Curated annotation (Swiss-Prot):
GO terms for molecular function: calcium ion binding; Notch binding; receptor ligand activity. CDD domains: EGF_CA. This is Delta-like protein 4. Interacts with NOTCH4. Interacts (via N-terminal DSL and MNNL domains) with NOTCH1 (via EGF-like domains). The gene is Dll4. Expressed in vascular endothelium. Expressed in retina at least during embryogenesis. Glycans are attached at N79, N109, N162, N297, N394. Keywords: Angiogenesis, Cell membrane, Developmental protein, Differentiation, Disulfide bond, EGF-like domain, Glycoprotein, Membrane, Neurogenesis, Notch signaling pathway, Repeat, Sensory transduction, Signal, Transmembrane, Transmembrane helix, Vision. GO terms for cellular component: plasma membrane.
Amino acid sequence: MTPASRSACRWALLLLAVLWPQQRAAGSGIFQLRLQEFVNQRGMLANGQSCEPGCRTFFRICLKHFQATFSEGPCTFGNVSTPVLGTNSFVVRDKNSGSGRNPLQLPFNFTWPGTFSLNIQAWHTPGDDLRPETSPGNSLISQIIIQGSLAVGKIWRTDEQNDTLTRLSYSYRVICSDNYYGESCSRLCKKRDDHFGHYECQPDGSLSCLPGWTGKYCDQPICLSGCHEQNGYCSKPDECICRPGWQGRLCNECIPHNGCRHGTCSIPWQCACDEGWGGLFCDQDLNYCTHHSPCKNGSTCSNSGPKGYTCTCLPGYTGEHCELGLSKCASNPCRNGGSCKDQENSYHCLCPPGYYGQHCEHSTLTCADSPCFNGGSCRERNQGSSYACECPPNFTGSNCEKKVDRCTSNPCANGGQCQNRGPSRTCRCRPGFTGTHCELHISDCARSPCAHGGTCHDLENGPVCTCPAGFSGRRCEVRITHDACASGPCFNGATCYTGLSPNNFVCNCPYGFVGSRCEFPVGLPPSFPWVAVSLGVGLVVLLVLLVMVVVAVRQLRLRRPDDESREAMNNLSDFQKDNLIPAAQLKNTNQKKELEVDCGLDKSNCGKLQNHTLDYNLAPGLLGRGGMPGKYPHSDKSLGEKVPLRLHSEKPECRISAICSPRDSMYQSVCLISEERNECVIATEV
């Protein structure tokens, strides 16, 4: 099951869990009423009159909640009417469809309370047979009222009601609607066989899992029998999917290290070398002689390291593999005692008396010489020029001189040793083999050589034990400390560390991976914008420094006129200082007024000034703080309301009268008396 499907399944189960109480609160079922027989022999109505010419009978059924005393009112559980079913007396047949259906169906959509009230009325109609309840002139024949309890079930409850005029036989029951179960038809269960569950519904509404499934909602498959619980899993029944590092039909076989040539494993990614092999990947042959038999002509092979060996030759042979014979006579080709002589490319047999031929195989004897031994019979051939011996059993040879060796055919398998036993032979088997010809292999695992619950594997060179966790050695006899990191549980290049206990481990994930085994990749977070932040901070600092420089320059410029003004004031004479009128005593109202200078008798240098225009540039050294020379053009500034003001000159009799305004203005006026006599100077300061 994929992660996406698991997530969808969990959401579906959550939704089911939320909706389940609501489903249990509602219910659905059917109250069934089967009319069987109605008898009205006299054709009488409830009012005592009779039907003419006969009653045309139909029924009205009203089902409602339990009432100890039945009262008229709504049929709370349902109602139904029948068409005309017969005349005075009749039997009602079962009918499953169409008009006149029997049993009558009264469905309900609530939890069945277990009690009810039922009113069955028989009516006579003179009108329509199919919808008689709407016809005018209907008359009541009889009615019966049943009050009681009724459990949900498929068994019909049969009853019969009689009165003085009529008799009604009927039966009834309550059954649940499709997919509803339980004592009150309130348990909803819909069988399904899909991704969200595989089950059928029991009579009580409980789930019954289909074969191959289990779990609360039958959504968990039952894996193949024997599938290893930890090493395998399944997404459908009878399946066994191996987890990483395991293989086999039941996921009980570990996968050795990639590249392991001649080795096995007891845990995934291990490479335990077979006997005779070494190296990291068990690819170095430590027993080359056994595996390849490089030495020829019966020579002895000795191992001398990985892929190394030495051949010890038998007499008469030489070469790296003893493949070269030293003498052509080494095979004793001459028979009947003939001697062999080596020649350049061949050999020559020197036959003893009585024999001839290339290998001294022919005899010059005849039967008269009794050449046959051990009871052999002589038979002449070629008109007496030669003979042939017919040997008795167990003897052979041209003269029956050799005892039959029944072991020459090498009948013993698997290295068994053949032994002659008179007319028969026996095989002496090597350990681990048995049988007449040593053809049966005795399992080396029968002796249970593996200790501590190790698994024995019977191989050609002997048993090999697969040890359980915590043990090692050829026979699993050595107890070792378990290393939880030995199986390589961490993925994506993570570093494994052994935890507090031997069976625990911790994976140190590389950047970009998370999870207990570092198996989940994550999106790399964007790097912090150090360049943008540094640039922004630098710009702010530069702007602050620039503002500070501008403010400092402005302060220096503003301080310079004040210093010059104070210096000019300090350079004035005491007389000039005494004739300096403070600026606070003059008010400029920007109105043209007359300025009168009264000099007494001597008026040569003084006069009356009318509409005197004040030039603010006359005394630039006395500008107020914040004023700039040349900033303001020559403008007319007039005095306001007339307030007498006297200015003293060098001549006591000379007075300057001015009209001043008491109102404040943006500018202050200063009147200076020049050091020259009989001369009045007015200076203004902005």
